[in-house]
């Protein structure tokens, strides 16, 4: 091999390396960095395509009414919530507290790029069951501080801080953790940590197995070759945030959990594939139940089959909560 050909090979390799680094930076900013100009603008189109929710805001609101709530529920949410705050990982995080009688509590965790107020339907329903409800804005969402979306991994420790806040209000609190999408992954990741005995059950609605698995699917949706872009973006996450995409694993956390868990998933979920339900359910070593909602897309189980959804939830938590 002559020097000229060797130079060409190194030039090609250098170009490929530079392209990989640039692509990984773009992928990281698009997926995680909320301050990036490419984050929100591209994300909305991806979510609409994956969940088939393109159209007017009214149409989307009606489709997700089980999650976001009716206009009356949204009004009730706005009028009755009390702002509360914690500090976790040097970030000031925001939540809304909805008081009720007794010592039953539920922490409600929203999904990717959403916010607590978009969970008004769930908040209202749990409150009608007699629960004190704490709806929280995840880091880098809503009124919480932060610029990096944690995909549930650092957020699991934020949940523990919210639990501590509840226990400062009520030492006898019986606590349910409920999450949808990224919120489901968050509560599953939290369940693998050592939690106070006050935490009685977990409800995970359409949670993903790991950040790696979910971003690999996202790369596919964006027609990006996941290798080596995802690998490089994962290294960036390790350098900047202290963990890589494979570390952020709900699948590994549920193996350590002893908290009774209800797994919920729609069969037509394309954003977090239905097959992830089987993986999570099989891996969990705790008491567990599973609800499959036929025909439901991502985060739509409560909208498609509200009676089935809430009867299942109510019957499940009744096993672990004392009146």
Model feature map: region roles:
Residues 123-145:
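Conserved alpha/beta-hydrolase
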Residues 9-87:
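An N-terminal hydrophobic leader/cap segment in hydrolases
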Residues 256-258, 263-265, 269:
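Short beta-strand/loop motif that positions the catalytic acidic residue
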Residues 250, 259, 273-282:
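Short alpha-helix in the alpha/beta-hydrolase fold that links the catalytic acid
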Residues 141-170, 174:
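Catalytic nucleophile-loop/oxyanion-hole region of alpha/beta-hydrolase
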